Amino acid sequence: MEKSKTPRLLEKYRNEITPQLMETFKVKNRFAVPRLDKIVVNMGVGEALTDIKILDKAMEELGVITGQKPIIRRAKKAIANFKIRKGQPIACKVTLRRAMMYEFMDRLINVAMPRIRDFRGVPMDSFDQAGNYTLGLNEQIIFPEIEYDRITRAQGMDITFVIKYAKSKDQAKELLKLFGMPFKESKE
C-alpha cells in the first residue's frame, strides 16, 4: 500500500512556520501557535431562484475546483424584497480540512491568484475579530481546473480561512503571510 504524500504547505507549516511563530510571539508550546483549522469556499447563486440549472453548474464547478462534493445551502428565512422563500436553494459550499485544505491553499496562492488580471495583492482589512480571513473572488476562471470553453457565466465565490489559536488579528495575519498569502502593501 502506497503511503500518501504530505502536502507541501503542511510540511512548511510544521518545519518552518511553527518555529518562526513560536519565536515571534514568544510561545513555548507548539500547540499554542496559530493554526489553519479549515477553509470554507462558498458560492452564492442568486439566479438559482429562477433557474436551478445555474446552481447545478455552480456545484459542478465548485466540486472541480476544490476536489470535494459541495453541499446546497438553503435560505434560512424569507426575504420578500429578493423574492426568496424559506428553504429555497441559494448557494453551495465546501468545507476543506486537513490535506485537501493545504492542497487547495497551495493552488490558490501559487496558481490561481497570479492569474487574476491587474492583481496587486489581497486586502489586509478582511479579518474578523476572531482572526478569520475572508477573501472574495469575482470569477472562477482563475482556477486552472475550470475549462474556459465550458463555463456559461462568471461566478464569484467567498473563501474563508478559519484560524485556530490566534489571539489577535496580527497573529492570524502573520500566519497567512508566512504561508505566502500576497497581501497588499499598506499605505502609511
Spans of features found by a protein language model:
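Ribosome-associated RNA-binding proteins
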Residues: M1-E188
